């Protein structure tokens, strides 16, 4: 079921799955990340760690987007409001061939 919370996530090219997370837990999930509480916990810990690096005098988070890259896939993590959006995408980038 597509909701306003997830409708944009459904249309991302090469998307293998997604999570929508708040401090209270997983709000929505689909694909390879459906009901993946473990990955949600790991991602939230990474976000909390990155948020410790705030600049003095700013209320904004120190980042809005974070990518965790593996050989075959990428986790694209975006913070919007009080929610963390995680999309697992196929990694189509390959190292250039040097001839």
Swiss-Prot record:
The keyword ATP-binding does not apply. It is found in: Lysosome. Coiled coil: none annotated. GO terms for cellular component: lysosomal membrane; lysosome; Ragulator complex. GO terms for biological process: cellular response to amino acid stimulus; positive regulation of TOR signaling; positive regulation of TORC1 signaling; protein localization to lysosome; regulation of cell size. Its main location: other. Signal peptide: none annotated. Keywords: Lysosome, Phosphoprotein. As part of the Ragulator complex it is involved in amino acid sensing and activation of mTORC1, a signaling complex promoting cell growth in response to growth factors, energy levels, and amino acids. Activated by amino acids through a mechanism involving the lysosomal V-ATPase, the Ragulator plays a dual role for the small GTPases Rag (RagA/RRAGA, RagB/RRAGB, RagC/RRAGC and/or RagD/RRAGD): it (1) acts as a guanine nucleotide exchange factor (GEF), activating the small GTPases Rag and (2) mediates recruitment of Rag GTPases to the lysosome membrane. Part of the Ragulator complex composed of lamtor1, lamtor2, lamtor3, lamtor4 and lamtor5. The Ragulator complex interacts with slc38a9; the probable amino acid sensor. Component of the lysosomal folliculin complex (LFC). Belongs to the LAMTOR4 family. This is Ragulator complex protein LAMTOR4. It comes from Danio rerio (Zebrafish). The gene is lamtor4.
């Amino acid at each position: 079921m597509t909701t306003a919370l997830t409708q944009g996530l459904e249309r991302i090219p090469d998307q293998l799955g997604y999570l929508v997370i708040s401090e209270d837990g997983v709000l929505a999930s689909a694909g390879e990340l459906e009901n993946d509480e473990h990955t949600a916990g790991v991602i939230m810990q990474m976000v909390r760690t990155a948020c410790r690096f705030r600049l003095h005098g700013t209320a904004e988070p120190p980042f809005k987007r974070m990518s965790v890259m593996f050989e075959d896939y990428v986790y694209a993590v975006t913070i919007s409001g009080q929610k963390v959006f995680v999309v697992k995408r196929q990694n189509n980038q390959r190292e250039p061939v040097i001839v």
